[in-house]
Amino acid sequence: MSIPGFGGTNGSLASDSSEFTQISIPPANEWRIEVPFKKLLKLKVTLGTLEINGSELPNNVELQLSGVKLPIYAPPSINKEHAKVEYKLVTNPDQSVLLSSEDEEFTQYLSDETNMDLVVNLAMYIESKRQIAKDLKTNEGDHALGPRVLILGGKYLGKTSLAKTLVSYAVKMGSSPVLVNLDPKHGVFALPGSLSATVINDSLDIECANGYGFTMTTTGSLSKSMKQPVVKNFGFSDVDENVKLYTRQIDQLGIAVLSKLEGIEDGSGSEVDGNHNKVRSSGVIVDTPPFTMKSFDIISSIVSDLKIDLIVVLGNEKMKIDLTKKLKHKIEQGSLNIIKLSKSPGVVDDVNDRFIRMTQEQTIREYFNGNHRIRLSPFKTEIDLPSSSSSASASASVSSSSSTSSSGLVIYKSVLTKEYESSMAFLPSGDDFEHITNEDENGGDGNDGDGRGIVEDIKEYYQILEDPNSSNLDNSIVAITHLPLESGSSSVTNGASGSLNMSSKRKRELLNTSVMGYIHVSKVDDEKKKMKILLPFPGVFPRNVLIATSIGYNE
């Protein structure tokens, strides 16, 4: 039996002779579990209703979870019947996981302390705002914009779990909200190091790494169940690595999201939902990295770029008060409301960096190889190493029998702010930076695609990777953008003080482009000038601009 988002076993697990253990979960209680990566938890709901982050678990279907710390919630029932689960712990057959130095063990316990009643009330309040949006019509006959919800808070408060729950409850009630992920540590329908926005119209896949699901960029499939995200490259896991690039990508993601709500093609390569009225009234749920009031400038940008009208502050009364003061003008205008929600008593507050890194590796591994339920066939090939002297030329089809000629490829990299500032410190006094001006040399108006003039230094965002080699590309993730290479043009290089000798129009295109997909560079042969890469599926290697990220991965 197979249900989208909930797959049965396929017999590939390591055999285990242990018997299933049964546990009874009272209504309005949580069964809290922590499953290490070296183990697999096989479980089956045999009676009643249970949820993981708002996604209802099917009865009598075996599920598999690994590397998770989460609660399984039993909603209140009229007859007060206990839900029942059978579970068994087995060794994870994934050898790459077994080779890790993880020392965590499986833990589980029941608790009647939960904030789910507050979460349900919040979900119903948001749904009431969606209904109001459906009832209100624009001059064009469209629904009004639905609620745009921003979830804020510090570390280990359950922001991501809340975002998943609100999205899942919205889908249950017939809505299709846009889930926006602004935490580059997570790969939400994308890989770590990215920001994404995805229309959610069916259940999240709790068995997938991070508990989201597959995308068409992974499988090459246009299956209805595959999500089609808008993905912006950031290239780092930590926002502080380049705050300017981060806020600029939020701005561009905001344009894409609002275009999607308007039913306008946004140029990102993501298809506009045919039923944009439903998406429009369903609104937006925004998940964020840990923020404090020191990050207010970023928070303010998010509120403006995504037209946020409801901020949910998790577990921090002081932050709620400070935000109310800072955003008083919006509150008085009636365009913004700020509420505080108590954090779940079951939030795990000892998640270490190693667990986060292993979760990232699982996300990347699943992107290329799939999981126990959906097996993917990643494609390995060898291509020419880009060089600073290469000119744009036609790409060839990826073939297992020969290397792909890719001498026209150009690889950029996201700029680490501290490295950029260090390089600027050595400039002679009075030297200016190369800026994108309001009137470029090609006669453009300097507009950034949304009618606004921009004046900024592109060197603060991207630089060309002038000397691609094993030291800077081995075991790395590279983003393939939607931006085509310029055919017949001369090569792009870093000029004086790292400037890019390309037109202002081209620089804007680079800054505004979205991510089509990813490749993994497993090894670079510096002598032969070749690099071995892994693609999610066979096909024509895109003749598009590439951006190297700081996200590493070993097969």
Curated annotation (Swiss-Prot):
<dbReference type="InterPro" id="IPR028606">
    <property type="entry name" value="Clp1"/>
</dbReference>
<dbReference type="InterPro" id="IPR038239">
    <property type="entry name" value="Clp1_N_sf"/>
</dbReference>
<protein>
    <recommendedName>
        <fullName>mRNA cleavage and polyadenylation factor CLP1</fullName>
    </recommendedName>
</protein>
<feature type="binding site">
    <location>
        <position position="30"/>
    </location>
    <ligand>
        <name>ATP</name>
    </ligand>
</feature>
<dbReference type="InterPro" id="IPR010655">
    <property type="entry name" value="Clp1_C"/>
</dbReference>
<keyword id="KW-0067">ATP-binding</keyword>
<keyword id="KW-0547">Nucleotide-binding</keyword>
<dbReference type="InterPro" id="IPR045116">
    <property type="entry name" value="Clp1/Grc3"/>
</dbReference>
<dbReference type="GO" id="GO:0006388">
    <property type="term" value="P:tRNA splicing, via endonucleolytic cleavage and ligation"/>
</dbReference>
<dbReference type="InterPro" id="IPR032324">
    <property type="entry name" value="Clp1_N"/>
</dbReference>
<keyword id="KW-0507">mRNA processing</keyword>
<feature type="region of interest" description="Disordered">
    <location>
        <begin position="431"/>
        <end position="451"/>
    </location>
</feature>
<feature type="binding site">
    <location>
        <begin position="156"/>
        <end position="161"/>
    </location>
    <ligand>
        <name>ATP</name>
    </ligand>
</feature>
<feature type="binding site">
    <location>
        <position position="69"/>
    </location>
    <ligand>
        <name>ATP</name>
    </ligand>
</feature>
<dbReference type="Pfam" id="PF16575">
    <property type="entry name" value="CLP1_P"/>
</dbReference>
<comment type="similarity">
    <text>Belongs to the Clp1 family. Clp1 subfamily.</text>
</comment>
<dbReference type="GO" id="GO:0031124">
    <property type="term" value="P:mRNA 3'-end processing"/>
</dbReference>
<keyword id="KW-0539">Nucleus</keyword>
<dbReference type="GO" id="GO:0005849">
    <property type="term" value="C:mRNA cleavage factor complex"/>
</dbReference>
<dbReference type="InterPro" id="IPR027417">
    <property type="entry name" value="P-loop_NTPase"/>
</dbReference>
<dbReference type="InterPro" id="IPR038238">
    <property type="entry name" value="Clp1_C_sf"/>
</dbReference>
<dbReference type="InterPro" id="IPR032319">
    <property type="entry name" value="CLP1_P"/>
</dbReference>
<dbReference type="GO" id="GO:0005524">
    <property type="term" value="F:ATP binding"/>
</dbReference>
<comment type="function">
    <text>Required for endonucleolytic cleavage during polyadenylation-dependent pre-mRNA 3'-end formation.</text>
</comment>
<dbReference type="GO" id="GO:0051731">
    <property type="term" value="F:polynucleotide 5'-hydroxyl-kinase activity"/>
</dbReference>
<dbReference type="Pfam" id="PF16573">
    <property type="entry name" value="CLP1_N"/>
</dbReference>
<dbReference type="Pfam" id="PF06807">
    <property type="entry name" value="Clp1"/>
</dbReference>
<comment type="subunit">
    <text>Component of a pre-mRNA cleavage factor complex. Interacts directly with PCF11.</text>
</comment>
